[in-house]
Amino acid sequence: MKKLSPEIITRRLANLPTPVFSDDLPVNVRREEIKRAIEQHQVVIICGETGSGKTTQIPKICLELKRGVQGLIGHTQPRRIAARTVAARIAAELNSPIGQAVGYKVRFADKISPDGYIKLMTDGILLAETQGDPLLHSYDTLIIDEAHERSLNIDFLIGYIKQLLPKRPDLKLIVTSATIDAQRFSRHFNDAPVIEVTGRMYPVDVWYRPIGVDDDEEEDAVIQITLPLVTFIRNGRNSNGR
């Protein structure tokens, strides 16, 4: 990996954002366990359901471990819109304008600062970077998010990075996946540890269409059930002050 001067490392450490974590997100309940796993292993598999907070919180956990100082924390997303929105969310949680501590690079858009710590990008962008930087010197940590989607880009990256890791013992890899594929990724990376995180659950109300409605009356039935729903939603927002 490219060696940074002591002066640059000192400056980056001094400017390292201090993340704040919400206990409302299930992934943060396992934060200490995740930190230990990252410290002790080169590869960690995070198995998290939708709503667990893994996408936005894992990069912050890496910051807490002072990752991102020697190189960037590279965080891939399958789609451009996801890379941009996740970057904006993490930047907001770190109270940093987008493009400074946290930036993104997608096709036709590059908002990365030389002083940044977290870089969101599509998996295609990272794959393209391997052509000019085969050892991925720019990164000290890589997060492959939504790996269970198994696109060609993701599969190529997973295979490439496995070959790269012995040449970059300083590089950490975190793979996030749905439940069904976590053990498969673990086996691929020589039985890397798997940490399972539950999703956040929300209450669900079931509203039924009125009984005995003929097809000709369907439009009226939709209105009958929609109006109470609109009233319910408005009252809920007003009671929450929103």
For the regions a protein language model found, what residue spans apply to each?
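P-loop NTPase motor module signature
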Residues: M1-R242
